[in-house]
């Protein structure tokens, strides 16, 4: 199973494509999509959509996993993440890819075994589980890989959480 994990954001959207066979993870590609802060929101979202569609066409994932929006005290930040999440969900739907959504707590639990794990613990486990030479940067990339790992765990244990 090839999984595309997404950590959405309008400035930086992390993505990671992994292959999950049996109980083994294989990283295929990981990076981030960036948009210029001086661009109008509609153009930033268009650029994000085009980037995600390019990734989907190139790697042809079997499914997509997107991190759910968590409560944020900054309403502007929460709205921006919400816009980016919508674009990711749209890209998956337009590509006829099943999309699963996971809360940060579920991602932490799946990757580290502890729902209140710190960011450094998650990053270390992503590096370890994927046998990477170093922790992926920026943080959004490691988070996207963690979401993909989470989906692999949920899929193998509970049959996935496809919405």
Swiss-Prot record:
Question: Where is it predominantly found?
Answer: cytoplasm
Check the record and name the InterPro entries matching this protein. RNaseH-like_sf, RNaseH_sf, X-over_junc_endoDNase_Mg_BS, X-over_junc_endoDNase_RuvC
Annotated Mg(2+) 1 binding sites: 7, 140
Q: How is the cofactor bound?
A: Binds 2 Mg(2+) ion per subunit.
> What's its EC?
3.1.21.10
Cofactors demanded by this protein: Mg(2+)
Quaternary structure annotation from Swiss-Prot or TrEMBL:
Homodimer which binds Holliday junction (HJ) DNA. The HJ becomes 2-fold symmetrical on binding to RuvC with unstacked arms; it has a different conformation from HJ DNA in complex with RuvA. In the full resolvosome a probable DNA-RuvA(4)-RuvB(12)-RuvC(2) complex forms which resolves the HJ.
Stated name of the protein: Crossover junction endodeoxyribonuclease RuvC
């Amino acid at each position: 199973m090839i999984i595309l994990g997404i950590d959405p954001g309008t400035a930086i959207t992390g993505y990671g494509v992994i292959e999950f066979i049996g109980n083994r993870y294989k990283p295929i590609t990981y990076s981030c999509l960036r948009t210029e802060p001086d661009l109008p929101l509609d153009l930033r979202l268009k650029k994000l959509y085009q980037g995600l569609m390019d990734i989907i066409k190139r790697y042809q994932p079997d499914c997509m996993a997107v991190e759910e929006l968590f409560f944020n005290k900054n309403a502007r930040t929460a709205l921006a993440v919400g816009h980016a999440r919508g674009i990711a969900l749209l890209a998956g739907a337009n590509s006829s890819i099943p999309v699963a959504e996971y809360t940060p707590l579920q991602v932490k639990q799946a990757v580290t075994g502890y729902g209140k794990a710190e960011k450094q613990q998650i990053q270390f486990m992503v590096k370890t589980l994927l046998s990477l030479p170093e922790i992926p940067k920026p943080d959004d990339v490691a988070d996207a890989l963690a979401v993909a790992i989470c989906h692999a765990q949920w899929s193998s244990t509970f049959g996935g959480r496809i919405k």
